[in-house]
């Protein structure tokens, strides 16, 4: 290879690597708004919902494995509300046991893997809850728009698998399998936006 060809190759390689770095960086997102809804079916029929909007985290497309998503989502279980104050206290203190520390006060979803990054898809991940870590799987709809990504996801969990005491309220129990719904909007990380403007 001639000196000129080597120079062209080095310049071209540097340019491609720079573009790749920007692409990876632009795939970093922070959570701009989110809501988690836990649907709890009752043993006697019907259900109630526990909700919170206290969700934060940062996610990014995994560079090492296609379909993987780095980062994590963290949900503040201390802010879950069902609409009945005494039931909220029972749920947080007697069952989720949020007073035991961060591993109980927060739930974390991490190591996400999706079939595709646009449209309806399936996903798997790890849920850290009540001091336990278990694999989860569910469905999601990802909608990129104007630089943002809206995500609506749903997955089931079994309360007993996380060693949570069997929930009862006024003699009525909650079924072992409950549904978790997550809706969020992710935007490019603020640090990355600032970096691009420099």
Model-derived regions: residue spans:
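Bacterial N-terminal signal peptides
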Residues: 10-20
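Low-complexity, acidic/polar, glycine-enriched regions of mature
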Residues: 24-198
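Extreme N-terminus of proteins, especially the signal/transit-peptide cleavage junction
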Residues: 3-4, 18, 22-26
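Bacterial N-terminal signal peptides that target proteins for export
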Residues: 1-12
């Amino acid at each position: 290879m001639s000196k000129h060809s080597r120079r062209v190759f080095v310049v071209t390689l540097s340019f491609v690597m720079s573009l790749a770095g920007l692409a990876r960086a632009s795939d970093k997102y922070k959570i701009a708004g989110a809501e988690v809804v836990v649907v709890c079916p009752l043993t006697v029929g019907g259900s109630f919902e526990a909700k919170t909007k206290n969700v934060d985290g940062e996610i990014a497309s995994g560079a090492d494995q296609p379909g993987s998503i780095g980062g994590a989502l963290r949900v503040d279980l201390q802010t879950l509300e069902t609409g009945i104050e005494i039931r909220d206290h029972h749920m947080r203190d007697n069952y989720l046991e949020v007073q035991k520390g961060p591993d109980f006060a927060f739930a974390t979803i991490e190591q996400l893997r999706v079939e595709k990054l646009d449209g309806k898809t399936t996903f798997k991940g790890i849920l850290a809850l009540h001091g336990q870590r278990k694999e989860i799987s569910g469905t999601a709809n990802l909608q990129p728009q104007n630089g943002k990504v809206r995500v609506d996801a749903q997955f089931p969990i079994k309360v007993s698998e996380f060693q949570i005491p069997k929930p009862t309220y006024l003699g009525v129990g909650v079924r072992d399998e409950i549904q978790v719904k997550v809706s969020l909007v992710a935007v490019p990380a603020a640090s990355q936006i600032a970096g691009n403007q420099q």
